[in-house]
A protein has these predicted regions:
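Substrate-gating cap/lid alpha-helix
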Residues: 135-171
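A short helix->loop->beta-strand "cap" motif at the edges of active sites that frequently abuts
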Residues: 119-123
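A short beta-strand-loop structural module common to alpha/beta enzyme folds
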Residues: 56-68
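N-terminal secretory targeting modules
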Residues: 1-36, 42, 46-53, 163-164
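Oxyanion-hole/transition-state-stabilizing segment in secreted/luminal serine hydrolases
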Residues: 43-51, 69-106, 114, 129-137
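Short glycine-enriched, charge-decorated loop/helix-capping segments at active-site entrances
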Residues: 56, 100-102, 140-146
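Short hydrophobic segments within beta-strands
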Residues: 37-38, 127
């Protein structure tokens, strides 16, 4: 019961954010150079402040997002006529919700194909799924996500990216891994 209530709350929150993004896309007078799309890792990351670039960066992350939701609501995340790069970081919630890898890859490939069709001059950066801390104190947080599982997904992401000239796979997994995971 409590889990279902939390799931329903999260879906309503995601819908609010999608609506906000669609409205911002409609009224924005700023043309983005780079659009970051993904889950809470993107949503809560202060991109403009920490990347220190003069390019216009737009953050379109949504907490709890999965590849299926992204595919269904891709229009809420994309706008502009001269986008240089679109950065995708998504998948950890698919793993956490036990979405089959094949389904997530199908969703992600459809996202890539849609972006490629609508933004043929934009470079797509597919960022690897980030590692999780596998210490005892984080078991409830990471749930069924393990670094071994994430490695397998990242290998599949890399293979998917290599099938598209417009897509570059960006490995962040190894760079963020330490002895604790």
């Amino acid at each position: 019961m409590a889990v279902q209530l939390l799931e329903n709350w999260l879906l309503k929150e995601q819908e609010k954010i999608q609506t906000k993004y669609r409205e911002l896309n409609r009224i924005s007078v700023i043309e983005p150079s780079i659009i970051f799309i993904g889950d809470s890792i993107i949503e809560y990351y202060p991109l403009q402040e920490l990347l220190g670039t003069s390019k216009t960066i737009v953050n379109r992350g949504i907490r709890g997002y999965q590849t299926g939701l992204l595919l269904k609501n891709l229009d809420a995340h994309l706008y502009g006529d001269a986008v240089d790069q679109i950065v995708l970081l998504i998948g950890t919630n698919d793993i956490g919700k036990d979405v089959p890898m094949s389904q997530a890859l199908t969703n992600l490939e459809s996202v890539i194909q849609s972006i490629s069709r609508d933004y043929p001059l934009s470079q797509i950066k597919l960022v690897s799924i980030l590692p999780v801390h596998q210490g005892e104190e984080y078991k409830q947080t990471v749930y069924i996500r393990t670094n071994e599982k994430i490695k397998a997904w990242n290998q599949a992401y890399q293979e998917l990216a290599s099938a598209y000239m417009q897509v570059e796979y960006v490995s962040a997994f190894e760079e963020l891994l330490d002895q604790e995971g």
